[in-house]
Curated annotation (Swiss-Prot):
Homodimer. It catalyses: L-quinate + NAD(+) = 3-dehydroquinate + NADH + H(+); L-quinate + NADP(+) = 3-dehydroquinate + NADPH + H(+); shikimate + NADP(+) = 3-dehydroshikimate + NADPH + H(+); shikimate + NAD(+) = 3-dehydroshikimate + NADH + H(+). Keywords: Amino-acid biosynthesis, Aromatic amino acid biosynthesis, NAD, NADP, Oxidoreductase. Pathway: Metabolic intermediate biosynthesis; chorismate biosynthesis; chorismate from D-erythrose 4-phosphate and phosphoenolpyruvate: step 4/7. It comes from Escherichia coli O139:H28 (strain E24377A / ETEC). Belongs to the shikimate dehydrogenase family. NCBIfam families: PRK12749.1 (NF009390). This is Quinate/shikimate dehydrogenase. NAD(+) binds at residues 132-135, 155-158, 205, 232-235, 255. PANTHER family: BIFUNCTIONAL 3-DEHYDROQUINATE DEHYDRATASE_SHIKIMATE DEHYDROGENASE, CHLOROPLASTIC, SHIKIMATE DEHYDROGENASE. It is an enzyme of class 1 (oxidoreductase).
Length: 288
């Protein structure tokens, strides 16, 4: 690819950043489509995020992807949020239209699309959702919009717990889905929730390097063959949770599915063109 002065820049702002497959995936897609954009990753944490957004405007970047730990903070720095992004309270995509910044969240649509592509119908189902960060709440919100009956969200009593309660209130007030929030330390409640659940989704970074030997499921007997277990983490590809799930006879969906589908939607938002899906799956080695 010969980058010229006519090319526009798209970024990814996150910390840490080195594990991300998004730059490779998006640049392969842009090159295949013959579009005059290039995608670059920038190591940006909460402290440096405000300055990074000013830089985005000054450099007239087309937009940026947003990942941990900036997804919730980023909502404060855009001019407009989609209804779904408001419900989530976090974004993973910014589109810059001549200095006017629009915030989107494709994490939820991407993850739910990956579930649907596997042949699983979420309507009327119950999901146990781990975590209350940007990715997790995006999945919960989109699942609620698309027909989940109940979401049982579990999170540690950390800085995200109050945000989880606020998220649950927003979803309960604006959709037909019922969301409850429980401390993950309550292992009895966790076990009872899993026993009646249709889907278990890990929306936390537990399982991602350097936590690849960890799982929030301490007892594999809590997993049952009727349960669909899905991951947001894709590095490593086969997390400990997915290994546990397969041993228990559960159907699983790895983090590549979410990465692919959320990235496809981002691509279209930035470029206005269709994402070369089959080509990207092939060159990236995604089985999704």
């Amino acid at each position: 690819m010969d980058v010229t002065a006519k090319y526009e820049l798209i970024g990814l702002m996150a910390y840490p950043i080195r594990h991300s497959l998004s730059p490779k995936m998006q640049n392969k897609a842009l090159e295949k489509a013959g579009l005059p954009f290039t995608y670059m990753a920038f190591e940006v944490d909460n402290d440096s995020f405000p300055g990074a957004i000013e830089g985005l405007k000054a450099l007239k970047m087309r937009g940026t992807g947003i990942s941990m730990p900036n997804k919730q903070l980023a909502c404060e720095y855009v001019d407009e949020l989609t209804p779904a992004a408001k419900l989530v309270g976090a974004i993973n995509t910014i589109v810059n239209d001549d200095g006017y910044l629009r915030g989107y969240n494709t994490d939820g649509t991407g993850h739910i699309r990956a579930i649907k592509e596997s042949g699983f119908d979420i309507k009327g189902k119950t999901m146990v959702l781990l975590g209350a960060g940007g990715a997790s709440t995006a999945i919960g919100a989109q699942g609620a919009i698309e027909g989940l009956k109940e979401i049982k969200l579990f999170n540690r009593r950390d800085e995200f717990f109050d945000k989880a309660l606020a998220f649950a209130q927003r979803v309960n007030e604006n959709t037909d889905c019922v969301v409850t929030v429980t401390d993950l330390a309550d292992q009895q409640a966790f076990a009872e929730a899993l026993a009646s659940a249709d889907i278990l989704t890990n929306g936390t970074k537990v399982g991602m390097k350097p936590l690849e030997n960890e799982s929030l499921v301490n007892d594999i007997s809590l997993l049952h063959p009727g349960l669909l277990v899905t991951e947001c983490v894709y590095n490593p590809h086969m997390t400990k949770l997915l290994q546990q799930a397969q041993q228990a006879g559960c159907k699983t969906i790895d983090g590549y599915g979410m990465l692919l589908w959320q990235g496809a939607e981002q691509f279209t938002l930035w470029t206005g063109k269709d994402f070369p899906l089959e080509y990207v799956k092939q060159v990236m080695g995604f089985g999704a």
